[in-house]
């Protein structure tokens, strides 16, 4: 009898130990990422799509020096935020390696090519549109519940830091994709912006209804200033006027929508990151940030290295830290570090109603 009791006690202890390994530590915080190629860290590698970053020289400055599916020479913004949190960057949701304790650290649902609208990026075929990313979020919650129970899952999701980056493709790869696009015939630009913002509000509200309580929402960058647009639309290196107009309409309305949404839910659940201004700082004065250029991409071909894809046959700069743009559309790791630093410590001009460092301090007190 005594031997049986001892065995039961040992079994109970083992179960307790295994369970404690699965339950996140009190100071750990899940990190959930949604959006497009600016934050995708490899989901599209698992899909039959042309929107991929799985070839050299992508990843040339990543710790492994190999392509990872990130549209960067090295780390991207989710990686840099994770670095600040002292955690591993969340894995792509489609990765078969995302399970058990890795699942409890969060997940990256982002997919290159998508937009707020489901008809954005149709030329890329098989991508994870934002509606599907939210379905995966619901699936993620079920998987986490299976590991730690529903109560602990709700605590994890409510306490998670969420990052969402959307909007640029709705202009570059939809409204302005071709002359007389379907959306440009349906809407004037101001009306299109209002429509896109209204659809984005539905996405963010759905995210809140699914349990997200700390959501960093980044705006678009200065879309007319990326090398791809300079190559197609610029005569003398000036930013493309129409896309800059789109950014100047979209971003202030996004901030106002987030303010209204916070008032609706009665908390500062949503944080607006003014990434347009963050980019313009180093685009307008690249030398002040240690760049030799903010017009020419490090990797590419044609004018401004802005034509086509970054491939093994492309022009490649020897020092990526001297270039604000890595490829025709995406910032270099160094530029991403500047943006991440503003997300962390930026003034109200950049982060509204507060920056990430303040969020982390406030949340640590609750």
Swiss-Prot record:
Gene3D superfamilies reported for this sequence: SGNH hydrolase
Recorded GO CC terms: extracellular region
EC number per UniProt: 3.1.1.-
Record keyword Transmembrane present: no
GO molecular function: hydrolase activity, acting on ester bonds
Main location: secreted
SUPFAM superfamilies: SGNH hydrolase (SSF52266)
Signal peptide: 1-28
GO BP terms in the entry: cuticle development; lipid catabolic process
Entry keywords, A to Z: Glycoprotein, Hydrolase, Lipid degradation, Lipid metabolism, Secreted, Signal
Glycosylation sites: 118, 355
Subcellular location: Secreted
Keyword Secreted listed: yes
One Pfam family from the record: Lipase_GDSL
Active site: 37, 327, 330
Family membership: Belongs to the 'GDSL' lipolytic enzyme family.
Designated name of the protein: GDSL esterase/lipase At5g33370
Provenance organism: Arabidopsis thaliana (Mouse-ear cress)
């Amino acid at each position: 009898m005594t031997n049986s009791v001892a065995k039961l006690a040992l079994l109970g202890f083992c179960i307790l130990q295994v369970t404690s390994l699965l339950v996140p530590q009190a100071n750990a915080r899940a990190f959930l990422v949604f959006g497009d190629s600016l934050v995708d860290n490899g989901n599209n590698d698992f899909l039959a799509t042309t929107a991929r970053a799985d070839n050299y020289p992508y990843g040339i400055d990543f710790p492994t020096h190999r392509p990872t599916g990130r549209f960067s020479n090295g780390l991207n913004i989710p990686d840099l935020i994770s670095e600040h949190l002292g955690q591993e960057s969340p894995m792509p949701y489609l990765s078969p390696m995302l399970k058990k304790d890795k699942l409890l650290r969060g997940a990256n649902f982002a997919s290159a090519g998508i937009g707020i609208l489901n008809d954005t990026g149709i030329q890329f075929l098989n991508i994870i549109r934002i509606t599907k990313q939210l379905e995966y979020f619901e699936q993620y919650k079920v998987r986490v519940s299976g590991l730690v129970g529903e109560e602990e899952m709700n605590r994890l999701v409510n306490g998670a830091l969420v990052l969402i980056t959307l909007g640029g493709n709705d202009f570059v790869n939809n409204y302005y994709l071709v002359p007389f696009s379907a959306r440009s015939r349906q809407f004037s630009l101001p009306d299109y912006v209002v429509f896109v913002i209204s659809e984005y509000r539905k996405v963010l509200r759905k995210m809140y209804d699914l349990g997200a309580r700390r959501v960093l929402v980044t705006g678009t960058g200065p879309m007319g200033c990326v090398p791809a647009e300079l190559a197609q639309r610029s005569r003398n290196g000036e930013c493309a006027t129409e896309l800059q107009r789109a950014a100047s309409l979209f971003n202030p309305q996004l901030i106002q929508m987030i303010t209204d949404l916070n008032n609706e839910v009665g908390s500062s659940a949503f944080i607006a990151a003014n990434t347009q201004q963050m980019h313009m700082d180093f685009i307008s004065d690249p030398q002040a940030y240690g760049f030799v250029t903010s017009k020419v991409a490090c990797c590419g071909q044609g004018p401004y290295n802005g034509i086509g894809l970054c491939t093994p046959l492309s022009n490649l700069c020897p020092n990526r830290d001297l270039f604000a743009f890595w490829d025709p559309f995406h910032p270099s790791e160094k530029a991403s570090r500047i943006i991440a630093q503003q997300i962390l410590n930026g003034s109200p001009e950049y982060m509204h109603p507060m920056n990430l460092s303040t969020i982390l301090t406030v949340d640590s007190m609750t």
